Every structure is written in C-alpha cells, then in structure tokens.
Amino acid sequence: LVLDVDGNPLEVGSEYYIGRAVGFYVVERFSEVDRGDPLSSDVQIDSGLSAYCRSDGFWGVPPSSFRIEKTEGFPNAYKIAYSPPTTSSQQQRYPDLHSGLNLVGLTDDSARVVL
C-alpha cells in the first residue's frame, strides 16, 4: 500500500507529484538477492525533466521492471526501484559514462511509455 503525503492511499487515475529527492537521472542499483515484486497495474511517472531525454521527460520502461518501496525513517516517503529483467535476452546493461551505474529504461525490447 502506497500512501500520499497526507497518509491517504494512492488512487488509480489520480495525479501525484514526486518530490525532488534525487538527481537528474535514474540509475539501477542491482541486487542478486532482492529483485522486488512486479507491479500489478500500470504506473505513469512524469519526470518533468528533459535534459537527458529526447522526448521531453518520457521514459521507456519494460513492463513490470520497477517497483515502489517504502523508505525507512520517513513517514509516507517512497523510492522507485528497478528490477532487472529475468530473461537472458533482456539482461543487457547500459552503464552511465560518468557514474558507471546502469541507466533505467534503456533496452532494445518493446517498452512501455512512462509519462
């Protein structure tokens, strides 16, 4: 269950804003032991940024490859985590040249548009 800043459950079809708690781009932190749970419904995320995207903030993310996790120590605070694909054809990595971390949403597979 994901809650908004007022402690109410998120509602399908409603708009929510993610506070600026991260940098300008999203990276993958790979874990062999915790791959997370796939989402059961579509989630659309508007990054509001276009500095690193050709399509004015649109991200392509393979289906069921990210999840929302509760953060520790902050009430109603969450983070978006990436679950790497499980098939060998999807396990290509695209490292960021500056940080060496893997970028989220870069794949040659069919993608779901995230707004």
UniProtKB/Swiss-Prot annotation:
InterPro entries hit by this protein: Kunitz_inhibitor_STI-like_sf (IPR011065), Prot_inh_Kunz-lg (IPR002160)
A GO molecular function held by the record: serine-type endopeptidase inhibitor activity
Q: Does the keyword Signal apply?
A: no
Instruction: Spell out the PROSITE patterns in the cross-references.
Output: SOYBEAN_KUNITZ
Q: Which SUPFAM superfamilies match?
A: STI-like (SSF50386)
Keywords in alphabetical order: Protease inhibitor, Serine protease inhibitor
The UniProt entry's coiled-coil ranges are none
Quote the function comment for this protein.
Exhibits Kunitz trypsin protease inhibitor activity.
Q: Which family does it belong to?
A: Belongs to the protease inhibitor I3 (leguminous Kunitz-type inhibitor) family.
User: What protein name does the entry list?
Assistant: Kunitz-type trypsin inhibitor 1
Species name for this entry?
Selenicereus undatus
